[in-house]
Amino acid sequence: MAKKKIYFGTNTKMYKTIKDTVEFVSQLQELTKDISREDMQLFVIPSYTTLRDANEAKDEDLLMVGAQNMGWEEQGQFTGEISPLMLQEVGTDIVMIGHSERRHVLGETDEEENKKVLCALNHNFTTLLCVGETGEQKDYGISEEVIRIQLKKGLYGVTK
């Protein structure tokens, strides 16, 4: 059985400009260039406006660059969304889906995250499905149940 890679990375949220992101990517690659990538893959998930520049700055042997979210349709009337085709066009490797801010601040559902997961996999992105409970759910002692449901619904229909 082939050994699976461990993925380790960061989401820069809405903190870095294009210049900041390119500098961060360059510094991260320089600092980690001597670390074997055989069993580990590093990734950075910057804001949308920095994706093209981050992808141009990356060394594909050292780093993956990903998107903070992705719509589940290739195109359409989805103001503010970004499609898998757009992400492929700028060289995106990995897509983060279901971040707590998308779920709890923007109200995205497990069913919507599932559509995104299936779409991302269909477009051959490495796909990160984020799961987690709120502080209130943790206080009620239902963390495991919440995460189990998020995983079950978020991965529904995934076959590989």
Q: Which positions does each model-derived feature cover?
A:
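Active-site loop-to-helix "anion-binding N-cap" substructures in soluble metabolic enzymes
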Residues: M1-K160
